[in-house]
Design a protein with these regions (language model features):
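Loop-to-transmembrane helix entry/capping segments in MFS-fold secondary transporters
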Residues: 44-45, 134-144, 252-253, 337-346
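Hydrophobic core of transmembrane alpha-helices in multi-pass small-molecule transporters
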Residues: 20, 101-119, 227, 308-322
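Cytoplasmic helix-loop-helix junction between adjacent transmembrane helices
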Residues: 109-150, 156
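MFS-fold secondary transporters
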Residues: 38, 91-95, 113, 185-186, ...
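Transmembrane alpha-helix termini and helix-breaking/packing motifs in multi-pass membrane transporters
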Residues: 34-40, 92-98, 154-174, 246-247, ...
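C-terminal transmembrane bundle of multi-pass solute transporters/carriers
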Residues: 60, 64, 71, 77-81, ...
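Helix-loop boundary and gating motifs at the non-cytosolic
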Residues: 2-57, 215-262
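Helix-loop junctions on the cytosolic side of multi-pass membrane transporters
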Residues: 99, 126, 130, 168, ...
């Protein structure tokens, strides 16, 4: 089986293309919101607050999404969560255009978007396994890493262009539009039959998933590594708006390029990871990725030269893929199908909760 075999499945290909567009819209939003926050407040501490607002809902939404994903149709859950995100993006657009959007409203809507996005992310990660044959699951998740990183390259670049050419209001509208193709695909595709968990109590099901993830050392280590990398590595992306303006002295287009450098290098690394398949041990990739993460962060911290800063951001993108693809593939390979949604949600919850903690600490230190 070749590394691109999952693309022969029309369902996977359709979700890959439209999911990339929707994720690009989300990345554009994730840059536009902190940009607008910084424009309103001129404070890196508020950037940390916006990161907390966007990611803290994962504490509730991610495990609930995991439980629902194991109980119910993942396709239906994705349609609902995607529809909610469209409504919220249109609300941001309408309030921004009318001049009614202030920092309080923006943070409140960021929290609501965080709930919807966290639910969708945890459900989509486990949904991939239902649109390819079981033997293609590992290859599909490697390709899914390409989807994530293509969108991370396109989204910030689009945001930089839109913010420079127009404003955040336009970015909010484009985010809503970007979801339409994925919702259309989800409305018509079918999925393969999988084992579903028997509904008991929500808390009991969350506890059962947590117990499984903790007792299996492979799953436990994967979740912990992803969490720590998010706290000490990925959190720097939430501070990009402040770094671009105050350290590197660049405008909106420069901010887009700074964050896109992460996506571009991540994309190239993801292609290499897909082509290599299982020829490199996942443990080797993770350990190497952790070292490279430290190198990239050190470069960003040590310079005020924009091009060098882009290099540092790009290096963290290489490291992120090396760690994230290995961690995600490990989780999806070893988790039982009836627990896939819950264990995946714990992995994502760790990443999403650690990110704002790191961003908040970084923002406070930067202001100090």
């Amino acid at each position: 089986m070749g590394p691109l075999t999952p693309f022969r499945e029309r369902r996977f290909l359709a979700c890959f293309v439209t999911g990339t567009l929707a994720a690009s819209g989300n990345w554009m939003l994730s840059l536009s919101v902190p940009y607008l926050v910084y424009e309103m407040t001129n404070s890196t501490s508020w950037l940390g607050v916006s990161a907390v607002a966007s990611n803290l809902p994962a504490l509730i939404a991610s495990p609930l999404g995991g439980v629902f994903a194991d109980r119910y149709s993942k396709r239906a859950l994705l349609l609902i969560s995607g529809g909610i995100q469209v409504v919220l993006a249109l609300t941001l657009f309408a309030m921004s255009r009318s001049g009614a959007l202030d920092i309080g409203n923006l943070i409140a809507l960021a929290i609501a978007m965080g709930f919807a996005s966290s639910t969708q992310t945890s459900v989509y990660q486990s949904f991939v396994a239902e649109i390819v044959p079981a033997r293609q699951i590992s290859a599909a998740y490697r390709l899914n890493a390409i989807q994530f990183n293509v969108s991370r390259a396109i989204g910030p670049a689009m945001a930089g262009f839109v913010l420079h050419r127009w404003d955040a209001t336009t970015a909010f509208l484009l985010n809503a539009i970007a979801f339409a193709p994925l919702l259309c695909v989800l409305a018509v595709i079918g999925t393969r039959d999988v084992t579903r968990s028997v509904a008991t109590s929500v808390i009991g099901e969350i506890a059962a998933g947590a117990l499984l993830a903790w007792r299996d050392h492979r799953l436990r280590l994967a979740v912990l590594i992803g969490t720590l990398c998010s706290m000490f590595g990925m959190s720097i992306y939430s501070l990009a708006a402040g770094l671009a303006k105050d350290v590197f002295r660049v405008d909106e287009a420069g901010l887009g390029l700074l964050v896109s450098s992460v996506g571009i290098m991540s994309f190239l690394t993801a292609i290499l990871a897909v082509s290599l398949g299982d020829r490199l041990k996942r443990s080797t990739l993770v350990m190497s990725g952790l070292v490279i993460y430290g190198l990239g962060l050190w470069i960003v911290a040590a310079t005020d030269i924009f091009v060098v800063g882009m290099l540092g951001f790009g290096i963290t993108g290489v490291a992120h893929v090396m760690v994230n693809v290995s961690v995600t593939t490990t989780v999806q390979t070893y988790v039982p199908p009836e627990f896939r949604g819950r264990v995946t949600s714990f992995q994502l919850m760790g990443i999403m909760l650690a990110l704002p903690v790191g961003a908040q600490v970084g923002g406070l230190v930067a202001d100090y």
